[in-house]
Amino acid sequence: MPMEYFEQRERALLGDRFDVLYAAPQETAERGVTVSALRSSPEQFAAKADFPLEASPFCKAAFVVHQPDFKPGRHPYYHAGVFYSQEPSASSAAPLLGVRPGMRVLDMCAAPGGKSSQLAAALQGRGVLVSNEYVAARADILKSNLERMGVSNAVVLNESPARIADALPEFFDRVLVDAPCSGEGMFRKEPVAATQHNNALVEHCAALGAEILENAAAMLAPGGVLVYSTCTFAPQEDEAQIAAFLAHHPEFTLCDLNACGFGRPGEENRAPGCTDITRCRRIWPADGGEGHFMAKLKKSPDAEAPAPVRVKPGKPAKTPPEWLDFVKTTFPFLADRPLTTAGDWLL
C-alpha cells in the first residue's frame, strides 16, 4: 500500500517526532491568495478585501482565506490580476531568491504560474522573466495566468531545460527550480496523489530533478542565486538531492535559511555526511502549511564558464520584423543575440 510505504519510511527517519511533525493544526488544507505588487500592496489589499483574511507567515504578500465557500475564480480581484489563488505555504520559495528590478530571472518549471507571478511582481516591470514549462498544455495555462496578472516583461517558453541551457549559458541572475516531484506534501490537498504514490515514482522524480538542477546551474551567472524547491518529503528528492549536487559542484555554496521566519531546518539523517544540509528549510504540516522543501544555492563569482555549445550550422530562419521590434523595445540586452539557430527559436 502506498501510504504504508510512506509512513514506514518517515517513521524510520523521524522516530518519535513523526506524530508531532505530521499533526496539522487544521483538518483540511489551508486556502489562500497571494497579492501581486503590480496591482496592490498587501496592506491595501487587506484593507479592501471583502472576505475574511489572515496574514500568512510564509510570505508577506500571502494570506489565508477563512471562508470555506470562497470561490477565488469568481471574484473581480482575481480577474483583475490583484491576487493569485495559492495555498499559502506554496508562496514561500520565490521570495528566497531576492529578486530585484532589472534582473534576468528564470522560472524553470513555471506552470501554472503562481511563483512566476511573484517573481514578476518583484521585478516591477524591469528586467526580464523567462517562465518555462515543458508540458505544452500547462504552458498555455501559464501564459494565460501571467497575462491576467498584468506581467509585461515575461517570455513564456515550452522547452526542455537542456535546450535552454544550450542557448543561454550563465545568462540569469536568479533561477527558481520548483522541481517536478512525487507530491508527498500534497496528500492532504490532493488525496488521489496518495493512491498513485510508490518508491518508483520517488526515484523517477529524483532523477528528473537532478537533471533539471544540472541545467539550471549551467544557466546561472557567476555570483547568481538558485533556489531549488519541492512539495515532497522524500530524501532522494530533497536533502540527498542537494548533497549530491554540492558534492559535484564546488562552485556552489548552500545558503543558510534558518532566519527566514518559517519552517524548520533540513534533516541531517536524510543526507548523511552533509553537515550543511540543516541550512535548507522544510515546512511540515505542523507548521501550518503543506509539505515543502527549499534550498538556496549561491554560485561563486569566480566560477568557470561552461564549455561553449557547438551548434551544427544550418540555413538561418527569416526573423519576423515584428519580433525584432519587440525584442529591441522590450529586451534591449537581447537585441545583439542570435534569435534562431538552425531554425530553432532561442527566445
Describe each PLM feature range:
Residues M1-L347:
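S-adenosylmethionine
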